């Protein structure tokens, strides 16, 4: 839901933190209760540019600064497969105009087995080794990301 809110309302939010989510637009459907197995299982693969087009179309003409974003995903998630983290990375680096390669990688960050890929001060992605869809939220990490520490 964080991906959807930040993609749809970039003028309302300053930052977001998505845990075990999917890229904005991945679950696009007919507007009713939609579950997309192709999205959930990581079979919807797009380029960063394609994802950016989807986000941009949610708020045509938006000229302001997009919210900063952090995403987390477990490598053992069988509800929303780990490929979805890669799609979120492609999406938000493109939307925020960041390089698609991290500027640094932090191993055992936040927890043992968690690797955080930092793409600048506006986007980071964390992969949690062996963690399922029930990924443990780290409130302090989120508050720090929001600058509320």
Predicted regions and their residues:
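Solvent-exposed, polar/charged alpha-helical surfaces in well-ordered, non-transmembrane soluble domains
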Residues: 3, 7, 83-86, 90, ...
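Hydrophobic/aromatic-lined pockets within catalytic cores
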Residues: 10, 93, 97, 147
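Residue-level "edge-of-site" marker
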Residues: 19, 105-106
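Catalytic active-site module of serine/aspartate enzymes centered on a nucleophile-bearing elbow/loop
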Residues: 123-129, 134-149
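Short glycine-enriched nucleophile-adjacent loop
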Residues: 1-11, 17-20
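The feature captures the conserved acid-bearing segment of alpha/beta-hydrolase catalytic domains
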Residues: 23-96, 101, 109-121, 129-133
